[in-house]
Amino acid sequence: MNKLPLAKRAQILSLLCEGSSMRSIERIVGCSINTVDKLLRDAGEVALAYHDEQVRGVKAIRVQCDEIWSFVAVKQKNRVTSKRATDPTAGDCWTWTAIEAQSKLLISYLIGSRDAEYALMLMDDLRGRLANRVQLTTDGHKAYLQAVEEAFGADIDYSMLIKLYGEPPSSPEAPRRYSPSDCVGTRTEKITGNPDPKHVSTSYAERANLTMRMRCAGSPG
């Protein structure tokens, strides 16, 4: 069985990190797309295990949470009429992230639905990786309320940063927009403990999610 040289494996991973598609990597490196796919999966499993083992006992100060939308094969609204109508893995999916505001360390993350079950999974995982009480900021997604309470109880300083949106656009293109209406302001809501109002923010988490989206844009084959 042929084994890909280390230099080529490093080149493939480097190109993947730069956002190159698997098809383009196949052409550049001169290997099959199955090889690229297997290396991507293997590297992902190693990274997952490394993060799970090493990101423990984190002495964080402020943590910000956010979710980023994507879809598998077909958007949820089009799934019923698509060829993937009976595929339980198809449709909308969300990447949940919890980032430490000072170091920008991604403490916890998961992929799934944007519902209470996954909110609790994120908060339980976050709680298990922290070494101390932190200030937490999330957006206004209601699923966080019960999740934070169940995971942390009163041992947290928690605020929501709620965005206020204007009227939805009335142009013919409006139904095809991915994003909501323009944000016209924000308000904060203290939920638990004594969060510092000066540090109620999700800016770092949102910036990290934008970077994730841009770097992953070319990754599908």
Question: What are these regions, as identified by a protein language model?
Answer:
Residues 1-221:
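Residue-level recognition of single "structural anchor" positions
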